[in-house]
Structure formats: structure tokens, C-alpha cells
């Protein structure tokens, strides 16, 4: 075990030689030094984890904390942003046990198979409505505002029980948060507006409960309004941004692999597996998952000291050839068992089954409705969100 740095610390690699592949440096580190020194923007020297095996170890070991008030992130945060002195109520993904355990238990009781099944027809209806509008307006279309952004937003509104008359406001503010070019002030104002809308929604559900997630949480009697609002805020933003990013980037990836689209058209039952492969291959959480060591831990021969920041590169782990054969190829028929696009361990994505349903329905409906779907610009002209925490296409012009 070594507590000295075998190589000089470097900043998190972000430069992509090819738009659908992670930075090449990550692959070299995974092969040569899967736990390597990482220089954080504030000057702290922590660690970057790039192999599948080491990533699983970190994410399943509670000696590595997910607490948002002590985390170190490997990217520059917007000017004016302040680190949390305390994690806000309900923001459970930024908490450790026992707080995380309590919230997770309550939410697991709401993400039931019955509720997910009940949502499927509505997600199908929402998807078809947006495809109808695309067809009515005719090509070309920008798939991001026409398809990728609204479908997940409306699906989350269904889950939370947002009244129909309020959904446009939720959509508009969520779009502001995700839109490239929004100023820091605009994003902050949109976050505040969403928080206010969810607080109002919680008050409504107290008075008029329905068969939705927020009403179900209220019925437990175990959460106060601040916690309920925080949970709603977290679910809305996390569930919208991740799935919307996958719908835009996933469609872009499929259109760049016409032979795989041909396989899907010949055998539509492959769409479920294609969703898994897209998540593995693209891994949109491009800056990784932050953790903080709570005590000294040995990992892959390196001594991680208490207080050290650890960044787990899910993108590198999901391209590990030691876990996935021919890992850099895109194959909708491959076995994707073990991918970590939804993270791993006790903090893995709670809404992953809903996200899978949304993507399977959306991709299959899109390519069924528009069998000649193609990019309307050169592939290299599609602008990508290289600076965003969730990698995605900011515009996706298509024709059919």
C-alpha cells in the first residue's frame, strides 16, 4: 500500500476526441492506474476511480460518504454558488445512513410495480401526442424541445400528481434550468420558482389527496412539508434532466449507428436491451459521482486518507473491457448486466425503472412513427452539452 502519489495529480479529463466516447485519458488511467491522483478546482488533491471493480468497491462502501455538505466536485461551480452548510430536508441522495435510509424506505414504498404499470399508458399517450405534433408541423424538427425535454417532464408531473393546468409552468422552469445559455440568475430564479410550485403542490395534496406519489408520502405521516417539498424538487429535477439528456443523446447515437437501428426495426423486442446499452455506452453523468472518505481506506494499493475527495468515473467504468467485451463498440444485442449508469450501492437511482419505461416507450415510438428518421445536419454539426454535468445534445435537428 502506498500513501505517496505515483503520478502527478491532474484535473479531470474532459476532452473528447469523438463525441460519443469518453476522454481517451480515462481509458489509459483505467488500464494503468485505476485509482489515480486527481486535482480538484480548489487545489485539493483527491482520487479518480476509473475501473469497474474499483468503482463498485467505492460505491458500495459506506466509508465513502455521499453527503452534500462535505463533498468535493471535480468541476468549476458557477460563480456565486455556495457549498451547503447543511443538506436541505428531503435531498436524500446527498445524505448518508441513517437519514438516507429513512427517506429511501419511504420512497421505495411509493415506486411500486403497480404505480409504474399504471404510468405506462400515460407515458405512451404523452409520447404519441408529441409525435403527432412533430408530424403535423413537418420536417425538419429540433428533437430536443419537440420530444426529449417535454416527455420526461410530463411523466414526472404524472408521478407527482401535478394538476394539468400547472404543468406548463413546471415545464417552462425545468427547460430554463437545462437550457444552454441560461444565465446563473435565470437558473437560480427557475429553481426558486420550481421549489415554490412544489411547495404549493404539497399544500394541495394535503387538502385533495389522489393516487400519486406525493399523496402517498403524505399519507405515511412521517414527513413534514419541507421534506416533502425537497423530495418533490429532487425527483422533478433529477428525473427530468437525466431522461431528457438520454433521449437526445441516445437518439443521436442511434442515428449515427444505422446498422443498429436496422436491427431494432427488424426486431422491436430489442428496444428494452437497447436502452440498457445506450445507458452503458453513453453514461451521461460525464463528471462522475463524488464521494468523500470518512476514514483511511486502502483501495487498489493506494491509501485514501480521511477527508480525501474521490470521484468515481461511471463513464470509464462502463467502458471497462475487463467487464464488457469489446466495450467501446455499440451493440444493442449485447449483455449489459452490471452497467452502472444508474450508479451502484445504496444510492443507485431510485427511479430507474420509470426511466427505463420512458426510454423504451419513447425510442420505440419515435422510430416506429418515423422509419426514415435521419439527422438534418452533418453529425459533427450537432451541438453537444460538453460543459454540463449531464452530457446531451443541446439541439438535434432531424428530418424524415
Task: Go through each PLM region and give its residues.
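Cytochrome P450
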Residues: 1-400
Amino acid at each position: 500500500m502506498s500513501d505517496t502519489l505515483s503520478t502527478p495529480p491532474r484535473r479531470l479529463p474532459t476532452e473528447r476526441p469523438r463525441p460519443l466516447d469518453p476522454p481517451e485519458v480515462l481509458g489509459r488511467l483505467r488500464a494503468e492506474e485505476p485509482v489515480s491522483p486527481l486535482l480538484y478546482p480548489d487545489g485539493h488533491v483527491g482520487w479518480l476511480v476509473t475501473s469497474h471493480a474499483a468503482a463498485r468497491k467505492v460505491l458500495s462502501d459506506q466509508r465513502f460518504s455521499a453527503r452534500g455538505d462535505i463533498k468535493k466536485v471535480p468541476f468549476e461551480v458557477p460563480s456565486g454558488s455556495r457549498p451547503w452548510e447543511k443538506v436541505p430536508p428531503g435531498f436524500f441522495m446527498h445524505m448518508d445512513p441513517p437519514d438516507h435510509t429513512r427517506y429511501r424506505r419511504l420512497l421505495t414504498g411509493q415506486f411500486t410495480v403497480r404505480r409504474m404499470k399504471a404510468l405506462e399508458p400515460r407515458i405512451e399517450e404523452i409520447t404519441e401526442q408529441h409525435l403527432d405534433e412533430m408530424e403535423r408541423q413537418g420536417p425538419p424538427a429540433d428533437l430536443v424541445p419537440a420530444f426529449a425535454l417535454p416527455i420526461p417532464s410530463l411523466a414526472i408531473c404524472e408521478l407527482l400528481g401535478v394538476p394539468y393546468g400547472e404543468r406548463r409552468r413546471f415545464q417552462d422552469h425545468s427547460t430554463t434550468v437545462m437550457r444552454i445559455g441560461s444565465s446563473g440568475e435565470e437558473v437560480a430564479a427557475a429553481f426558486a420558482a420550481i421549489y415554490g410550485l412544489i411547495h404549493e403542490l404539497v399544500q394541495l395534496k394535503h387538502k385533495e389527496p389522489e393516487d400519486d406519489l406525493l399523496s402517498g408520502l403524505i399519507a405515511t405521516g412521517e414527513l413534514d412539508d419541507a421534506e416533502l417539498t425537497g423530495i418533490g424538487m429532487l425527483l422533478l429535477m433529477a428525473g427530468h434532466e437525466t431522461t431528457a439528456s438520454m433521449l437526445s443523446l441516445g437518439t443521436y447515437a442511434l442515428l449515427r449507428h444505422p446498422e443498429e437501428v436496422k436491427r431494432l426495426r427488424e426486431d422491436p423486442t430489442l428496444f428494452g436491451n437497447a436502452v440498457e446499452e445506450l445507458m452503458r455506452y453513453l453514461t451521461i453523468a460525464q463528471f462522475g459521482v463524488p464521494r468523500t472518505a470518512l476514514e483511511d481506506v486502502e483501495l487498489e494499493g493506494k491509501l485514501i486518507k480521511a477527508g480525501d475527495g474521490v470521484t468515481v468515473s461511471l463513464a470509464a467504468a462502463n467502458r471497462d473491457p475487463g467487464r464488457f467485451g469489446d466495450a467501446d463498440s455499440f451493440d444493442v444485442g449485447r449483455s449489459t448486466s452490471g452497467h452502472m449508469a444508474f450508479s451502484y450501492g445504496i444510492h443507485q437511482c431510485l427511479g430507474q425503472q420509470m426511466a427505463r419505461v420512458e426510454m423504451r416507450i419513447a425510442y420505440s415510438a419515435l422510430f416506429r412513427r418515423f422509419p426514415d428518421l435521419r439527422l438534418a445536419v452533418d453529425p459533427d454539426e450537432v451541438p453537444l452539452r460538453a460543459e454540463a454535468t449531464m452530457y446531451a445534445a443541446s439541439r438535434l435537428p432531424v428530418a424524415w
